[in-house]
Each structure stands twice: as C-alpha cells, then as structure tokens.
A protein has these predicted regions:
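Sec-dependent signal peptide recognition
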Residues: 2-7
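Hydrophobic h-region of N-terminal signal peptides that target proteins for export
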Residues: 9-17
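Acidic/His- and Gly-rich active-site-bordering loop/insert found
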Residues: 19-130, 137, 147-156, 334
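Extracytoplasmic/secreted envelope proteins and their assembly/folding machinery
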Residues: 34-38, 53-56, 60, 137, ...
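Hydrophobic beta-strand positions in extracellular immunoglobulin-like domains
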Residues: 86, 223, 336-338
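Acidic/histidine-rich catalytic neighborhood of metal-dependent amide-processing enzymes
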Residues: 125, 131-208
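Acidic-enriched catalytic cores of C-N bond-cleaving enzymes acting on peptides and small amides
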Residues: 182-186, 195-204, 210-216, 230-316, ...
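C-terminal catalytic subdomain
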Residues: 326-340
Length: 340
C-alpha cells in the first residue's frame, strides 16, 4: 500500500517543474495512508449490495479537512462515485487516478479475524479490500492530499475517481460516469489497479505496468441424468458426469502465447532476478525447456503461468439437495480469462 502511494505520487511530482523540490517525510506519509486504509476496510461495502456511498463519504470528509473540494455522482444514492481534482496550468490533458470502493463477498466463518476489522499484525493489515481495491483508494486519496499540502504546480490536472460497482455492477460506477459525466473524468490516461508490484527485503523489486487486459468470460456447464436413490449407482449420474467434465476442463492446458509486453516483461525480469529464477524467464520459449518451465510456473508462480495463456478455472459447483438422493441436474461455472 505505502509503496504504491509513493510510486504514484513521485510520478506526479516528477511531472512538475524541475526547479521545484518537495521535502516529504515518506515514513509519516506511509503511516497516514495505512491509517486511512484501515478505516476504509472497516466500512463494509460488499457488492452486492454495495453501500459504496459510505466509503465515498469517508473520503470526502478527509478531503474536506484538507481543503480539497470533491463531488459525489450517483445513479443509486447508496452507491455514489466520488470525484476530486487538483488543477494544473492546463498545458497538458489531465491524468486520472482510479480506485474502486466496493469489495467482493466474504465467508466470515473462513476468516481468522473479522474481515472488516482492519487488524494490524506482524506488518500486515487483515481485511476485505486491503488488496482489492481500498489500497488504491487510500493511495489516490493521499496523492490528492499531498499535492494540496505541497502546493504542487503541474502542467496538467490530476483527477481522482473513487468508483462504485467495479465488482460486477459497472452500470452504477464507471459506465455511469462515462455515459453521464464524462466531462469530469476525461483524461489523457489513467492510473488504476492492474500490473503487479513485488517487494523483497522491504524494498520494491519490480513494479509491473499493465498495457492491456484479458477478457473475462463465464461458461456454465450443465449435466443432466436420471434421478434416483443414492443406494443405487447409475451411469448417468449428473454429479459424476459433471465431475468428469470439470476435471477435463481443469487439466486442459491452453496454448501458450506471448505478445510484445510479455516478451519484454520476462526479458527484463531475467536481468534482475537470481540465477535460478532468471533461467526460467530466459527460456520460456525454449522448445526443450518450455514444458518444464510452464509446469514450474503453475506450481510456484501462478501469476506468470496465467499471463502466458487463456486460463480456465472452475469456481462454483451446484448439485443435489439431499445427501441420499441422486440429483437430476448438476452445474459448474468456469471462470475464463482470455488473452487479448
């Protein structure tokens, strides 16, 4: 979280006049940003139903205390988006910083701690939204705060958008802002979630930049068979048929395909990695080594395995209503992320 805020802010400060210099206590900034992240995590905004307005109101209150104007835009009054702007001299088009205020659902019984507690322990913060995406909301908010405190003069406006509905309901969030309020978020480019940062020994080792995205697709597999009593096995048991289909889909290794971005990524990663890792990155396309490398990625570096191919992952299985009854139908959802 702290590293992200520093990277974003430094990129903006570097865009200012070379004659300007800013004295910043980054440790203090980091602590302040983390304090805000904890408070954001404490606000439940599970989508559905959302309740993102509560998060937006917190952000607005923090910005108001810093003398920063902001405005809420809502298709649904409980699911507001927040926009704030730091004005530059207008020589260049604006830059947009984004973070989404909703989070995915939780199964509290699976958690060791309350998912909305923001507990700090052993250098970690525990809670839903710490990684997706209230960390970016806190970072974006801190960018706006520091630009204001330091009176940073830029050649472009900096816009901060805390959006609702990213987790599956964009009609109240980014779609609404684009279709109805494009003028307040129109920018030359945007900094948002995506890419990946790696910290080693307390320092940033790599910071990946996303140039395009996979396309998400959902496929539902449905198996039908003859219902009956669990004491009498059947060859057309819908659960058995579905299980075999899911197993085949899980074992299917789609074709590996690199593009200019991933080729550059592995080449540069090899140059800064330990020898035992570098050899993997250097030989991803080596016909004699690629299968073994891909298998190692699958076992130990799933992120690297995924960016090489379209992924097919079963996520939800639905079957049966009694433990002693063979159901007539069973279904499974496959989460497919297609290479561009």
């Amino acid at each position: 979280m702290r590293k992200l805020s520093l990277v974003v802010l430094l990129s903006l400060l570097n865009a200012a006049s070379a004659e300007q210099s800013y004295l910043v206590d980054w440790d203090a900034v980091g602590r302040e940003a983390i304090d805000h992240l904890v408070e954001l995590v404490k606000i439940p905004s599970v989508n559905p139903p959302g309740n993102e307005t509560a998060v937006a109101e917190y952000v607005r209150a923090v910005l108001v205390a810093e003398g920063i104007d902001s405005k809420l835009y809502a298709l649904d009054p409980t699911r507001a988006n927040l926009v704030a702007r730091h004005e530059g001299n207008g020589r260049k088009p604006p830059i947009l910083i984004m973070g989404h205020t909703d989070v995915v659902g939780v199964q509290p019984e699976k958690w060791d701690a309350d998912p909305f507690s923001g507990i700090r322990e052993d250098g970690y913060i525990y809670g839903r939204g710490t990684l997706d995406d209230k960390d970016n909301v806190a970072a974006g908010m801190m960018v706006m705060i520091l630009l204001k405190r330091l009176v940073v003069e830029l050649d472009r406006d900096v816009i901060f958008l805390a959006e609702s509905g990213e987790e599956g309901t964009p009609d109240v969030g980014i779609n609404f802002m684009v279709e109805k309020h494009w003028d307040v978020i129109d920018a030359e480019f945007s900094i948002a979630e995506g890419g990946q940062g790696v910290i080693r020994d307390g320092r940033v080792h790599t910071f990946g930049i996303e140039t395009t995205e996979k396309m998400p697709r959902r496929v539902t597999l449905v198996a039908r068979g003859t219902p009956g009593h669990g004491s009498m096995p059947r060859l057309d048991n819908a659960v058995m048929i579905l299980a075999n289909a899911v197993a085949k889909a899980s074992a299917w290794q789609t074709e590996m395909r690199l593009n200019e971005t991933t080729e550059t990524y592995f080449r540069r990663l090899a140059a800064i990695s330990p020898p035992d890792e570098a050899v993997l990155y250097e030989n991803v396309t080596n016909p004699e080594m690629t299968l073994a490398i891909q298998q190692q990625f699958l076992e130990t570096f799933p992120y690297h395995y995924s960016i090489l191919r379209t992924s097919v992952v079963p996520t939800v299985i639905d079957a049966g209503f009694r433990r002693n009854v063979i159901p007539s139908e069973a279904s499974a959802i496959l989460d497919i992320r297609m290479l561009p």
